[in-house]
């Protein structure tokens, strides 16, 4: 009888531990994915100057996790969902003198979350003057038709006024800037730092 009791207890213990084992396996898989990705990118990293460093604050870097960084490599959309991702991507775009793209995209996100009609009109004018109008300080690269459509909508701006322009800039970043970001020194050094020395193992 004592043998049966202890056998049953051990069985229960195994069942109780399974959720922990599943979570541990998921974390292990994430780590393997990140390790493999970084290994494939290390040749790019090692050809860069070792003396260079990013300007991100240490507090921002320390709170990131390998899981989150892996998400950034899946799509631009997943990168932009993360505030830290936005910050690092903006830093990269700034190094390429194209930070106006993400600034415009973020301004549009804020604009679409605005409920008050008067505030909407005010924000629409600010976005137009800063990013859309000819010779704007941070003029974005959109076609004439889209620019003209936004200009007409300013008379009675709606939530969708900048949708086409925002989509155009997102596609531009997705096809042009994002692939380079994933191979950039800014991203690779950050990712390697958060995964530790196991990347090279």
From Swiss-Prot:
Molecular functions (GO terms): GTPase activator activity
Entry keyword set: Cell membrane, Cytoplasm, GTPase activation, Membrane
Primary subcellular site in the record, as a coarse category: membrane
Subcellular location: Cell membrane; Cytoplasm, Cytosol
Membrane topology, record value: Peripheral membrane protein
Pfam families, sorted: RGS
One GO term describing the cellular component: cytosol
Function: Regulates G protein-coupled receptor signaling cascades, including signaling downstream of the N-formylpeptide chemoattractant receptors and leukotriene receptors. Inhibits B cell chemotaxis. Inhibits signal transduction by increasing the GTPase activity of G protein alpha subunits, thereby driving them into their inactive GDP-bound form.
Matching PANTHER family: REGULATOR OF G PROTEIN SIGNALING, REGULATOR OF G-PROTEIN SIGNALING 1
UniProt name for this protein: Regulator of G-protein signaling 1
Organism of this sequence: Xenopus tropicalis (Western clawed frog)
